[in-house]
Structure formats: structure tokens, C-alpha cells
């Protein structure tokens, strides 16, 4: 085989251009010709269809038996209220479902900011309008929020025979990504002018930052494609054995660069965990045995790793890489 994948250009520049509070453009260059569309289309599909998140899956509204009921003193129809609830942006920490309540006395608007939540549940768009009370009436509701991935129709969760009158089932769009578009522009490196520049335009609901969403999607693609790298046979395998295995650069980053709280960082260093690669190989059980590191710190660590497409309990075949030990601090 003439040449290897190392002959291909590898992107050197990643530029994040903020377009608003929840929207950003991520620019990647230079890419070999054609790779802009190859990577852009793959990332777009993953961002739109496979991102995990939370959504309202069920609502119980006082005085309402079904979505076609009428409510005295409420400007919106029940169908419109349910549509508004589907746009609720919720982030849950270390749990798979939660029950939220809302109780408002009219007249006036009912917004997502009126929802009462537990300490480990956040509403990221408190300005969202749920309904408008035109009279001095009360609006009381219970909302069930669940964690999932992609899109799930209400009919996929329960059959008609299992439904209780008054419990309104909602189709759930769990993805925190609202919109993704990409363009491929021309790039140049020295005398080469036939290269690609990929521009991803990503908008989220605020639960994840756009760059976090792209990082997660890229990590998911990498994980899915890694099985092909292990295929046996041919010169490819021989060449891989001749050279030292590549290590994901993020694993080489010191713990301090994760921007954890001082308490969490010090607890990890006390256990000789100085690099991200050291951390991801530990399990939750192992970390909870660390002195002064509680569940709150563990949750912070898990969320920080997830934002980088990583998790606890990972297996690293080539860790630590050669040369890293020279800089490691003995705790």
C-alpha cells in the first residue's frame, strides 16, 4: 500500500465563534478535499438524532381530563399548553426522571420560571411561556421529566390500555440541539488551494453549550468507528505496530485544566490522579472511597468528563504513554 492515513492533512485550527447565548459556529480547518462534507454530514446527523437529554413526557393539569378539554380563564387551549411544555429545557443531575410541579394564581402569565424543582434539576429557559391566565383562577400541574435520546413518540412508552385519565402523554424530543447546519468553504495551506474548511452552525436549548454538543457527537462517532481500527490483516496493522499508538490529547491534560472545584481537584491529586487519563480509568466506587470526596464532587467530575465525551471506568490500553512519567507528580 503506497502511503498511509498519515499522509492526509489533519485539522490544526478549531475556532469557536459565539453567535448568541445558545448558538455558535465551530470552524475546523484545513481538511482534505471532500472531508468537509464527510465529517459535516456525519456530525450533523449525530447532533440531531443521537444526543441524550431530558424532556417532559407526561403532564397532569388540574381540571383537565384530555388534551381537548377546555379550561376556564386560560387563554391557550390544552393542546397549545402541551406544545409549550415540549419546549421546556431541563437538565437533571444524577437521575433519570423527576416530577416537577407548578402552581400559579391568576391573572397573569405562567412561565417555566414558576416551576418548582428539586435541587438537582435545572430549568434552563425560565422565560418560556406555558400559558396565560386571564382571570383570577389557579393553574396547578404536575410534570414528569425523563431522560432519553433522540425522539420518542408517546405511543412507544405506554399502550392505550395502560393510560390513566388525566395523565397527558407527550411526544418527547430529548435532544438539547435545536438546529444544526454546516457549510464547506475553501481553505489554503501554502501552495495547496483545493482544501476544505468546515463551518458547523449549532444552536442548543441551553442545556449544553454548542461546543460541548459537538465534542460529545465527535466522541460518539470516534467510539463507534474505533471497532474498524481493530480489524486484522494487511499492512495497516503492521504499520500500526511499528509506531507508538496515538493517545487522545485530552487524556494528557492535567486535572487542573478540567476547572474542577479546588476541593475535588485536591482530593484527586491526593490519590495520585494528575492527568485526565488517570481519572477516566477510575470507577465511581473507587472515587467514593477517596477521603473528603463526596457524591456532590463525584457528580461534578462525571458531568465535566461527559462534557468532553469521556466517562469514568474507561479502559486505556496504552496508559500511561512513554515519557509522561517524567512529568508526573508523585503524590
Swiss-Prot record:
SUPFAM superfamilies: C-terminal domain of RNA polymerase alpha subunit, Insert subdomain of RNA polymerase alpha subunit, RBP11-like subunits of RNA polymerase. Residues 1-232 are annotated as: Alpha N-terminal domain (alpha-NTD). Disulfide bonds: none annotated. The keyword Transport does not apply. Its EC number is 2.7.7.6. Residues 247-331 are annotated as: Alpha C-terminal domain (alpha-CTD). GO terms for biological process: DNA-templated transcription. The N-terminal domain is essential for RNAP assembly and basal transcription, whereas the C-terminal domain is involved in interaction with transcriptional regulators and with upstream promoter elements. This is DNA-directed RNA polymerase subunit alpha. It comes from Alkalilimnicola ehrlichii (strain ATCC BAA-1101 / DSM 17681 / MLHE-1). The gene is rpoA.
